[in-house]
Swiss-Prot record:
Belongs to the three-finger toxin family. Short-chain subfamily. Orphan group IX sub-subfamily. It comes from Bungarus multicinctus. This is Neurotoxin-like protein pMD18-NTL1/2/4/5. GO terms for molecular function: toxin activity. Residues 1-21 form the signal peptide. Pfam families: Toxin_cobra-type (PF21947). Expressed by the venom gland. GO terms for cellular component: extracellular region. Disulfide bonds join C24-C45, C38-C62, C66-C78, C79-C84. It is found in: Secreted.
Length: 86
């Protein structure tokens, strides 16, 4: 009986996601938008947008830090909620 109980406890722990995993939108031009599961150390979702050759470019994903540098007309947005980088 103890062996069965121990086996059930081990299986339960192995099957549960013991940590919270953030999801962020990724890619740039897919419709509908796709998401990705971020690694444990990734706390931010980001969205970079800029104009190149007269066309708006967008990049989305997970990030360890939030880059706040805006250069060459590049706009960077960071957030901490799931799928907040739409």
């Amino acid at each position: 009986m103890k062996t069965l109980l121990l086996t059930l406890v081990v299986l339960t722990i192995a099957c549960l996601d013991l940590g919270y995993t953030k999801t962020c939108f990724n890619d740039d031009l897919t419709n509908p938008k796709t998401t990705e599961l971020c690694r444990h150390s990734m706390y931010f979702c980001f969205k970079n947008s800029w104009i190149a050759g007269g066309v708006e470019r967008i990049e989305r994903g997970c990030s360890l830090t939030c880059p706040d540098i805006k250069y060459n007309g590049k706009y960077i947005y960071c957030c901490t909620r799931d799928n907040c980088n739409a």
